């Protein structure tokens, strides 16, 4: 399951506060961040997710996306997790780009805490395996550096995202780059670099499913 983070339109419906799990309440969804040049996160994640889906399908994988287009509203973060749960997804990858400090660059991976009450038995442990494999493989395939502002490129014990909190199986979020950094913004806007990012995600997921 690939989850292209955020959506195009920011209407009152996505500002509704929902229970995002683990005691977290937040907006149903948002439009995300953007580069200083105006390239939006939702467009980046949609493009990368579709590129990764094509690569995975070429390898024979069955791939679902949590939203059908880049022109609508939603779905809510709660619904995105539900889509993965109902599909009994072997892995749930939430694809994002960060809006971090302008002086920071690189990617990082977010993983749930061991005590996540929503995961199936072993799901949290498998999420940590998925996070480690994606962290190492994405770096090796893309050559992109680990985040300079998130230690080691890991955000452990994350409870800030609804998809991580509410997913039952292996789940991570990958923040592929920092859109507020000029160098990373140039990568985000380059189709060839987005293809490289998709290849890194594909390789990480394939490696995890082979473990």
Language model segments and positions:
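Active-site-proximal loop motif in hydrolases
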Residues: 4-48
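Active-site-proximal helix/loop segments of hydrolytic enzymes
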Residues: 39-211
